[in-house]
Swiss-Prot record:
PTM sites of type N6-carboxylysine: 100
UniProt cross-references to PANTHER family, sorted A to Z: DIHYDROOROTASE
InterPro entries hit by this protein: Amidohydro-rel (IPR006680), DHOdimr (IPR004721), Dihydroorotase_CS (IPR002195), Metal_Hydrolase (IPR032466)
Class of the enzyme per the UniProt entry, highest EC level: hydrolase
PROSITE patterns linked: DIHYDROOROTASE_1 (PS00482), DIHYDROOROTASE_2 (PS00483)
The protein's annotated pathway: Pyrimidine metabolism; UMP biosynthesis via de novo pathway; (S)-dihydroorotate from bicarbonate: step 3/3
UniProt-annotated binding residues for Zn(2+) 1: 14, 16, 100, 248
Enzyme Commission numbers on file: 3.5.2.3
GO biological process: 'de novo' pyrimidine nucleobase biosynthetic process; 'de novo' UMP biosynthetic process
Binding site for Zn(2+) 2: 100, 137, 175
Catalyses which reaction(s): (S)-dihydroorotate + H2O = N-carbamoyl-L-aspartate + H(+)
Organism: Roseobacter denitrificans (strain ATCC 33942 / OCh 114) (Erythrobacter sp. (strain OCh 114))
UniProt protein name: Dihydroorotase
Gene, per the UniProt record: pyrC
Amino acid sequence: MTKTLTIRRPDDWHLHLRDGAMLRAVLPETTAHFARAIIMPNLVPPVVTFAQAQDYHARILAALPEGAEFTPLMTLYLTEDTDPDDVAAAHANGLVHAVKLYPAGATTNSASGVANFDNIRAVLERMAEIGLPLCVHGEVTDDDIDIFDREAVFIDRVLDPIRQATPGLRVVMEHITTRNAVDYATAQDDTLGATITTHHLVINRNHILAGGIKPHYYCLPVAKREEHRLALRAAATSGDARFFLGTDSAPHTDANKLLPCGCAGCFTATNTMSILAHVFEEEQALERLEGFASLHGPAFYRLPANEARLTLTKTPATFPSHIETEDGPVTVFDPGFVPNWTVV
């Protein structure tokens, strides 16, 4: 029986750090285990321009714990007014590694997102030319589309037409939640990748709604039926390089979660690696954890894999129920079981 597991230090290809007091509180939870992360730009106001990305990058570096070795990989928030030349300059500088597409109104702080996709055609064409990936929150926001169907409809109505109209555009389907997304991704070439979160490997929609509503399991895209969770687990543990870790760790204070209209997001930075090792062991795929967490993402983003290592031991993991911030506590994601693996 395996007692220890050593892998290349993992990266998080979808992370929310927020800003200010929240940034200072949650950043150490990520730097404890991860070497790099794709940083989401949905602040208020959003990180739209190269200059704004430079400023946010500086704030992240200033908040790093002493001795931390961590590289924030910045993104720009795509709007219908985004300047293709600004995007190209940000990419050429090496600071910005992706542009993020939020359909207007799809998730937290997405009001500035895209409503008319024809208005971003020039930006997407420039991105295809320079090889800059587009990270996509893949949900339509039409009121007449059921929330559990919005990812599947987005693939047909928006994503596939964008890819057909922009040959060579490199796209990351972020935080996929459906068998539809898994099937679409596995049928594509290497210009398409897909991130899978920790929590979507663990929970289905029953965990949110059955036996009383569980606000701390509410996220967007919302967790789906069990058949979709199982499809995600199969994809994540398959060894297919199209699939890689993006936690979508999304901290909100409890005061902002426990409301009549509470915020969406699960905070998983603290215990992701322990949970993933547990899940991969359940799927008899521990040897593929390194690929999912440490190798597939860098390969897609054309970056070297980390040389540093992370070691886990086969001992039950303990972690706090909350972390404290200046604005109040943030609940750490509870997988509903004690993970069998602990990060050394």
